[in-house]
Amino acid sequence: MARVCVVTGKKPMVGNNVSHANNKTKRRFLPNLQYRRFWVESENRWVRLRLSNAALRTIDKNGIESVLADLRARGEAV
């Protein structure tokens, strides 16, 4: 599935563009997704993930090993 963060599950949201005259038209708010490679020392390989910026902060805080363990517990293929 496109435009979904594998760690946080963030997806596009729907909202309105609001003009100065208060006219409203539908728009999508897209998550800030980035492709990042992480070296996993225990597996001796690179892992490429599509992450939101919030997920990058989570990995900085908890470490890639912990995040990958959570993904595998949820049944994600990494």
Swiss-Prot record:
This is Large ribosomal subunit protein bL28. InterPro entries: Ribosomal_bL28 (IPR026569), Ribosomal_bL28/bL31-like_sf (IPR034704), Ribosomal_bL28_bact-type (IPR001383), Ribosomal_bL28_sf (IPR037147). One of its GO terms (biological process) is translation. GO terms for cellular component: cytosolic large ribosomal subunit. Gene3D superfamilies: Ribosomal protein L28/L24. It comes from Thiobacillus denitrificans (strain ATCC 25259 / T1). Keywords: Ribonucleoprotein, Ribosomal protein. PANTHER family: 39S RIBOSOMAL PROTEIN L28, MITOCHONDRIAL, LARGE RIBOSOMAL SUBUNIT PROTEIN BL28M. The keyword Ribosomal protein applies. SUPFAM superfamilies: L28p-like. The lineage of its organism: Bacteria, Pseudomonadati, Pseudomonadota, Betaproteobacteria, Nitrosomonadales. Belongs to the bacterial ribosomal protein bL28 family. One of its GO terms (molecular function) is structural constituent of ribosome.
